[in-house]
């Protein structure tokens, strides 16, 4: 493997192992699952298994992937990558610490270079409780070897892959990965297509932070960019705008109720207008979303 020359600041990573988030994605145990490969460009594919979406850049210099799904999917993911050129990625970017995006680190980590934001490594070394579960720290070879605080780039197969930190949205370690020349962007779990997102308040996530991050992305992304979400189908800027509108509008409903002195139970009982029914049909149901928003705006 060619020598990697990058500026690094020692980093951090962590994952929740039996849980995921997204339609039909919250299954951590070993089972029969098919990894679907969806062509995005000539040398970028989106792979869908059981957890978060995986992006794969292919070419003569090796494969780079963004996220690596659950450990139960690793063998099938490796087989799908082999069909694209190599069963073992040269580089792996983790968009955040949750296990449905990172458990595959343990399968690939002895041969692949794992890269993530510094907070990801920290979370992996000491995972917080999530959905009432405490997971074990990641083994050393499953931790990011290279970390950063703001951004970094890798150049491979004629493409610049630029990772940019977006603070305190889905978690406190979220990265958006840009395939600059191809105009393809992996947004990790800052983006759930047509569904309410999971915002991990206990891992530094915050609904207002997510709103701010998505607003920034909408302003800066090219109109014709191809967007790979953390969960859901391949998307575009209009999909991101619609998602952002849903988050902003429902967050305001909760904020207005809080200002009126309503309790969380009262807010849940009131619910949301019918037009948000589809958004609450995924992993994050409407009641859970209302609680996430309430907790975010209650935090001091």
Where do the protein language model's features map onto the residues?
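Positively charged n-region of N-terminal signal peptides that target proteins for export
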Residues: 1-4
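Accessory terminal helices/loops
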Residues: 8-27, 219-224, 234-300
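Metallo-beta-lactamase
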Residues: 22-25, 39, 62-64, 70-72, 120-169, 171-172, ...
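Conserved beta-strand hairpin/beta-sheet module of binuclear metal-dependent hydrolase folds
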Residues: 36-80, 177-179, 183-189
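Active-site metal-binding motif and surrounding structural segment of the metallo-beta-lactamase
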Residues: 37, 60-64, 72-115
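Divalent metal-coordination and catalytic microenvironments
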Residues: 43, 57, 67, 81, ...
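Extracytoplasmic/secreted envelope proteins and their assembly/folding machinery
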Residues: 54, 74-78, 105, 188, ...
